[in-house]
C-alpha cells in the first residue's frame, strides 16, 4: 500500500523508512545502468540528490526541460523501465517514486523489482528479479511512498512504468548490508555508512541530517554535513553512531569542512559496548577523546589510546554547530557480528 503526499514541493516525510539512507543515491555510488528509453530526459536524473527543480517555459531541442527521466510516447505494446545499481547494497525498507513537475506526462502506474548479484555483473547478467512493489497507480506531480517488507539483501532495482512518461526521482531507503569480505581482518572506517554503520540518535538535526557525517566521500558544501540549530540555553549537541560491528578504534577524524562560521568550538568522543550495557547507562560510557578544541573548515585527526572494544560511539560537540564527516578507523574484533537494530 502506498502513501501519496501530493506535491513534491511540500517536503513532508510520512513513512518511518524515509529516515533511513537512500541506497540508490548517486553521491553514495548509485548508477542508472540501463533504461528502455530516455528520449526526453536522461535516466541519470532519477538518483540525483536534492529535490527536483523546474523552470517553466525552458525549452530545448526535445521540448520542455525536466529534472527527471522521461520516455517517448509509446505507440505499441510493452512498457518502459530503468535499472539502478545501488551504491549501498542492503535491505530495502521502502521506495519513493516522485513525479514532481510531471503533470500531463506522468506514468499512470509503476512497479519496482529487485535482485541480488555478486561481483560486478553486466546488465545482461542480472537475474532473479523479485517484485518488491506491486503495480500501483501514480498521480502527477506527487510523492508516492511504498513500504517494502522483503528482508533480503539486494544490489539492484528495476523501476517499471506503465506504459511511458516521466519520473523525477527514485528513492530506495533501507539498511546497508556490506560484503564482510572487505571488512574482516582489515583496518576500516567503523563509522562508515557504506560499511554498515548507522546514526541511531542525535540531539538536533534542524539544518541537515546526522546521517551525512558518516556518508561516503567529502562534503561539497554545508548541506552535505550535519548542522544543528543555535543553542540559546545550556547543554550541547550530540549524536550516537552504531558501528559496523564491535571493534577497536585507533584513529578518529573530525572534519569541519565548509563550516567556517558555524563549526563547534570543541568536541569529544565516548564509547560503549552495548552488548554488555544499555546506551541509557551513562556510567557505562568511557572516554575515547577528551574535549578538544576544533578549528573551522579543517580536517582533524587524533590517535586514540583506549583499546577497549566498542559497539557505539557518541560524538559531543560544544555547544552546537556542525560537522562535515566523522571517520573512526580501526578493526572489527574477530568474533564481530553486524550490530542489529530494533
Feature names for model-found ranges:
Residues 59-67, 121-146, 212-231, 278-304:
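Intrinsic, low-complexity N-terminal interaction/targeting segments
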Residues 105-118, 262-275:
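Short, surface-exposed beta-strand/strand-loop-strand elements in extracellular ectodomains
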Residues 167-178, 328:
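Short, structured interface segments
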Amino acid at each position: 500500500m502506498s502513501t501519496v503526499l501530493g506535491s513534491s514541493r511540500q517536503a513532508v516525510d510520512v513513512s518511518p523508512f524515509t529516515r533511513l539512507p537512500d541506497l540508490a543515491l548517486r553521491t553514495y555510488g548509485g548508477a542508472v545502468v540501463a533504461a528502455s528509453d530516455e528520449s526526453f530526459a536522461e535516466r541519470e536524473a532519477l538518483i540525483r540528490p536534492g529535490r527536483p527543480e523546474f523552470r517553466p517555459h525552458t525549452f530545448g531541442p526535445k521540448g520542455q526541460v525536466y529534472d527527471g527521466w522521461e520516455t517517448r510516447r509509446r505507440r505499441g505494446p510493452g512498457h518502459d523501465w530503468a535499472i539502478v545499481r545501488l551504491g549501498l547494497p542492503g535491505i530495502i525498507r521502502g521506495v519513493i517514486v516522485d513525479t514532481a513537475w510531471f503533470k500531463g506526462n506522468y506514468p499512470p502506474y509503476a512497479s519496482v523489482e529487485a535482485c541480488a548479484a555478486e561481483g560486478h555483473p553486466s546488465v545482461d547478467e542480472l537475474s532473479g528479479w523479485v517484485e518488491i512493489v506491486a503495480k500501483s497507480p501514480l498521480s502527477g506531480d506527487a510523492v508516492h511512498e511504498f513500504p517494502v517488507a522483503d528482508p533480503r539483501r539486494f544490489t539492484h532495482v528495476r523501476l517499471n512504468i506503465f506504459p511511458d512518461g516521466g519520473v523525477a526521482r527514485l528513492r530506495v531507503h533501507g539498511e546497508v548490508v556490506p560484503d564482510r569480505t572487505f571488512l574482516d581482518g582489515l583496518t576500516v572506517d567503523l563509522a562508515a555508512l557504506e560499511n554498515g554503520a548507522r546514526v541511531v540518535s542525535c540531539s538536533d538535526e534542524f539544518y541537515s541530517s546526522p546521517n551525512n557525517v558518516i556518508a561516503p566521500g567529502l562534503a561539497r558544501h554545508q548541506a552535505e554535513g550535519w548542522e544543528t540549530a543555535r543553542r540559546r540555553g545550556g547543554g550541547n549537541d550530540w549524536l550516537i553512531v552504531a558501528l559496523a560491528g564491535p571493534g577497536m578504534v585507533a584513529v578518529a577524524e573530525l572534519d569541519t569542512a565548509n563550516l567556517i562560521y558555524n563549526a563547534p568550538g570543541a568536541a569529544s568522543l565516548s564509547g560503549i559496548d552495548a552488548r554488555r550495557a544499555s546506551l541509557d547507562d551513562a556510567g557505562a560510557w568511557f572516554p575515547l577523546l577528551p574535549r578538544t578544541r576544533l578549528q573551522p573548515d579543517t580536517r582533524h585527526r587524533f590517535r586514540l589510546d583506549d583499546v577497549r572494544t566498542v559497539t557505539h560511539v557518541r560524538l559531543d560537540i560544544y555547544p552546537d554547530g556542525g560537522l562535515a564527516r566523522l571517520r573512526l578507523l580501526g578493526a572489527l574484533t574477530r568474533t564481530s557480528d553486524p550490530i542489529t537494530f530494533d
